[in-house]
Amino acid sequence: MSNLIFSLTQPKHVISMPQATFTNDDHVVISLIDHPSSQDLKRRDQHEVLFRRINTFLIKNKIIKNNIIDLGAWIGDNSIPWAKNIAGIVYAIDPSPNNCNFINDTCKLNNITNVKTLQYAITNNNQILTTHDDLGHCSFVYGNPNNNGQNKVQAVSLDYLYASKSIDNIGYIHLDVEGMEYKVVEGSENVINAFRPLVSFEQHLEIDNYELILALFKKHNYVVFLINEILPGCRHDCRNSLAFPVEMYNDNMIDEIHAYIGKTVLERK
């Protein structure tokens, strides 16, 4: 009997779950699923470090509030940490079914219930877009001037998703759409007018028409700042920018962001 009792009370061997810590996203810890993309996710904390820290400041100070659109969500390296830092919904939008499945599975493992994946490409209207790239990480613009790539996907606008009640109450839009930024904003007029969200967007300053998208934001009464941060693994001219609606913006906010991250990186355009 004593041997039986002894065997029943032995501690079980616990297999530790691999994890990623996003130190620059308020130290969010994510358990990783058994998938090749999990290693990419684990490394993302050290990419776009200043951008991540700026977003953390904006979330902690409730400048980013309500729901978030993460467009070009890829493997959820922004969507998932943000979902753990806000009470609202993160709409993770990406054209790749594999990326959306990876995000969903990672969220399930971590009991994250406020991420909604939407498998679409986004542009200024409803149409078929094509790419020569794998959908997992692609551009519908670069290297495809005639829209005749072998991979085809359904594209819609953010205004279409809003009208169809797929998205609502938007406080922040993040765009990483490889050359489609202008068209995405062009197709978001109703969303912008209804919610006046903060917008971040990535551009290649030497090959994208940065002045064109600046003019579009100014037309909507936004103030744009470039984040002067070199992005590892990207072209040397790749930069993120932040567009603040004029009613949200003030000089003190910019000073507070610089104080929080410890350096001056925001350049008004």
Task: Give residue ranges: language-model regions.
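S-adenosyl-L-methionine
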Residues: 1-162, 165-167, ...
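Short internal loop-to-helix segment that lines adenine-nucleotide cofactor pockets
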Residues: 39-69, 116, 142-195, 206-207, ...
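Active-site flanking residues adjacent to catalytic metal/cofactor-binding acidic residues
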Residues: 69-71, 93, 120, 173-175, ...
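Short, glycine/acidic-enriched loop or turn micro-motifs at the edges of active sites
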Residues: 73-75, 97, 122-124, 177-179, ...
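Hydrophobic packing residues within well-ordered alpha-helices of enzyme cores
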Residues: 82, 103, 131, 184-188, ...
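Internal alpha/beta domain cores that form substrate/cofactor-binding pockets in large enzymes
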Residues: 158-163, 168-201, 206-261
